[in-house]
Amino acid sequence: MANSPQAAKRARQNEKRFAINKARRSRIRTFLRKVEEAIASGDKDAATAALRAAQPELMRGVSKGVFHKNTASRKMSRLSSRVKALG
């Protein structure tokens, strides 16, 4: 339990940020899962479209502080190379 008003406020803010960041992470994971599913089905057009949709979401996560930029770059790079390798 927070002992000062300042600590209580920080605790409230942390809960609020946690909920917002959790929703953002979930949304980004959904976009990435759509790319994975398209790759698994072998549909290059669908995979490319899903990748194009996922990139701005991933970068938005970086700008909002949900992911480190290197993490997002690594994910994009790996997915891009897998989409490129499709027939």
UniProtKB/Swiss-Prot annotation:
| InterPro entries assigned | Ribosomal_bS20, Ribosomal_bS20_sf
Q: Name one GO molecular function term.
A: small ribosomal subunit rRNA binding
GO biological process terms, alphabetically, are: translation
The entry's keywords: Ribonucleoprotein, Ribosomal protein, RNA-binding, rRNA-binding
* Top-level taxonomic group: Bacteria
Region annotation Disordered: residue ranges?
A: 1-22, 65-87
GO cellular component terms, semicolon-separated:
small ribosomal subunit
Q: Which family does it belong to?
A: Belongs to the bacterial ribosomal protein bS20 family.
**Purpose of the protein:** Binds directly to 16S ribosomal RNA.
Under PANTHER family, the record lists: 30S RIBOSOMAL PROTEIN S20, SMALL RIBOSOMAL SUBUNIT PROTEIN BS20C
Q: Which HAMAP family match?
A: Ribosomal_bS20
Q: What is this protein called?
A: Small ribosomal subunit protein bS20
Q: Which organism is it from?
A: Ruegeria pomeroyi (strain ATCC 700808 / DSM 15171 / DSS-3) (Silicibacter pomeroyi)
